[in-house]
Amino acid sequence: MHRVQNVQSHVGEYAPDILVVGSCFLDYVGYVDHMPQVGETMHSESFHKGFGGKGANQAVAAGRLGAKVAMVSMVGTDGDGSDYIKELERNGVHTAYMLRTGKSSTGLAMILVDTKSSNNEIVICPNATNYFTPELLRAQTSNYEKILHTGLKYLICQNEIPLPTTLDTIKEAHSRGVYTVFNSAPAPKPAEVEQIKPFLPYVSLFCPNEVEAALITGMKVTDTESAFRAIKALQQLGVRDVVITLGAAGFALSENGAEPVHVTGKHVKAVDTTGAGDCFVGSMVYFMSRGRNLLEACKRANECAAISVTRKGTQLSYPHPSELPAGVT
């Protein structure tokens, strides 16, 4: 059974500036002192269950900062799905167009975090997300009329739901004059790369990391200069604006074909890097929605992501406005 979830706590018409179409997963996180070897059974130092999924992470990052943001995703009709919708609302994310299915449970991610390096390993089980098809989304939203409304400024998509749904939504939003943001994580498979390339002209802002940029362009991204070359190659494929995130090394970007620039990362003692890239993307679009240009939005998003890696957890680590350094507004 598929149905649109109508949340009663939102009264009257809601007109978000930002719409996120993506994934909602439950995170099962274990903290270990080293990553297990093949055949090794080990104890975790601690464990927690949280809320994740790249789409929801980005929506929550924006919502916590005060954005007018709405989420469209597919969760189960199970208790986890109900809990997730409530959690989104608690973080300022509008949920009236969330979809639910009785055909599968809510998706989940199994995450190991190395407490010494802060690196992680993640295994995803999409579950309900597999039913999030473009045909279903069109049917439940009156061919997008309910979600791509007049006045919507930004659409954010990732690569964690069925790719046809992502690409169909991006193309439709672009045709309606919406600024489309595509974060190509997790890294696309070779067949997905070939599907993505023809859709890049419909992407206003493409935001890959260095691995994803290399997969799309065929160019290795190992330093600032190679990142600049990849940016130019992506713009030749039809993208207007490009941001390549470089982990602790910061990011490189070009807005509207201008010469690329590099901004170094902020050095902090990282505890858990899970979801830091999502924090960056959601925060970046929030600051853009407040009138910042791409460079200034990314600088501020860099501050938000730097805060997030100093804390355990994914969405729980994302900052509220009161936690930001002076001048980061």
From Swiss-Prot:
Q: What class of enzyme is it?
A: transferase
Q: Which residues of this UniProt protein bind substrate?
A: F25, L26, D27, G53, K54, G55, A56, N57, E160, D278
Q: What is its EC number?
A: 2.7.1.15
Pathway(s) where this gene product acts: Carbohydrate metabolism; D-ribose degradation; D-ribose 5-phosphate from beta-D-ribopyranose: step 2/2
Q: Does the keyword Nucleotide-binding apply?
A: yes
Q: Which SUPFAM superfamilies match?
A: Ribokinase-like
Task: List, in alphabetical order, the Gene Ontology terms for molecular function in this entry.
Answer: ATP binding; metal ion binding; ribokinase activity
Known catalytic reactions: D-ribose + ATP = D-ribose 5-phosphate + ADP + H(+)
Keyword annotations for this protein, in alphabetical order, are: ATP-binding, Carbohydrate metabolism, Cytoplasm, Kinase, Magnesium, Metal-binding, Nucleotide-binding, Nucleus, Potassium, Transferase
Asked if Nucleotide-binding is a keyword of the record, the answer is yes
Q: For this protein, what does the record note about how its cofactor is bound?
A: Requires a divalent cation, most likely magnesium in vivo, as an electrophilic catalyst to aid phosphoryl group transfer. It is the chelate of the metal and the nucleotide that is the actual substrate.
| Position of the signal peptide | none
GO cellular component terms, alphabetically, are: glycosome; nucleus
The Swiss-Prot or TrEMBL record lists the needed cofactor(s) as: Mg(2+)
PANTHER family xref list? RIBOKINASE, SUGAR KINASE
- Please explain the role this protein plays, according to its UniProt record: Catalyzes the phosphorylation of ribose at O-5 in a reaction requiring ATP and magnesium. The resulting D-ribose-5-phosphate can then be used either for sythesis of nucleotides, histidine, and tryptophan, or as a component of the pentose phosphate pathway. Specifically phosphorylates D-ribose. Fails to phosphorylate 4, 5 or 6 D-carbon sugars (erythrose, threose, xylulose, arabinose, fructose and glucose).
* Assembly mode: Homodimer.
Per its record, how is this protein called by name? Answer: Ribokinase
Question: Lineage in the entry?
Answer: Eukaryota, Discoba, Euglenozoa, Kinetoplastea, Metakinetoplastina
